[in-house]
Amino acid sequence: MGVFAEIGQRLRQQPLARCFTRIPADHDRFPARAGRGSYDECSTDFGRKAEREPATAPEEDTTMQNPERQAEQESGPTQGEDAVTQLLKPHETDLGDFSVRRLLPAAKRTMVGPWIFFDHMGPADFPPGKGVNVRPHPHINLATVTYLFEGEILHRDSLGSLQPIVPGDINLMVAGRGIVHSERERPEVAAAPHRLHGLQLWLALPEADEEVEPAFHHYPGADIATRTIDGAPVRVLMGSAYGVTSPVKTFAETLYVEAQLKTGQRLALPESPERALYVVSGTLRLGGMTLPEHSMAILSQAARVIVEADTDSRIALIGGEPLGERFIEWNFVSSRKERIEQAKADWRAGRYPVVPGDEEEFIPLPD
């Protein structure tokens, strides 16, 4: 059994990412109930009824003036406690030579805009013969977003997709009415010592798009431009910020930004109806408030929020439209509880399609 398969077994015993968690629209006042969850098995999203076609990403490495910083210079930033409404600590599972930190869903906060699932995996160093080994499993009514800093994962799905993902790429898998996928490693990767470090997030789909045809989209890193904003390299992975629009497909207003800051560098953050800042590495300061490594700051809607790096840091900013009520159980998310029950019955009865090239194994529905 590979390491990622172990993650599923162990996280099912943890009081996070409830398998049957009801997520109300006013989720700030109704924390998720404790329950069982598993890696790559929980999430949510909602948005506009019309699907947006993204614009083409601008070219690489152009220095741009930060419009958020311009606003701050005119009227001053929002800082400290006024900017941070909640500070989340990760639920960490140690798997020996691998760890996973889960930030969403959490008891204090279930969703940020359309984002409902946020896992930070690694960094992990694997010896030969160990690594990523997630057997085929299903999803409905959501989209998975995988982004790596180091390493490689091999994606297969029931549509016939076969796609390695490497650092800088985005893999967007739209489950829609139902998809099955696995995440493993190419034999040549698994045969040698290797490292893995990255983020896996989930979005739920707008009610009007929950039952769309499943799809898989791969965006090479070269198609996602790096911009230098106030001296810091910034990548707009999804949505629009800093005058840049990502080519990655969205179904609702969605924001996903990665940035790297050197010690002492400052960055004004873009606006969004809801937003949260995750410290992948390093330490940040927001006014007089310290944001430690692996913490997630739920930010206010104030337009001007500026962070400063106490040490060399990497950050991920997520946000977007707040969502309506969603249910979540195992790998299934839906606005309708009965739809999840149907998905469970279909998986139990073997009615989902198989993954070509990975037909021999599957993850059973948890008891």
Model-derived features: positions:
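Jelly-roll (double-stranded beta-helix
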Residues: 39-367
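Generic extreme N-terminus detector
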Residues: 5-7, 67-68
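Short linear motifs in low-complexity or flexible loops
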Residues: 5, 15-17, 21-25, 30-34, ...
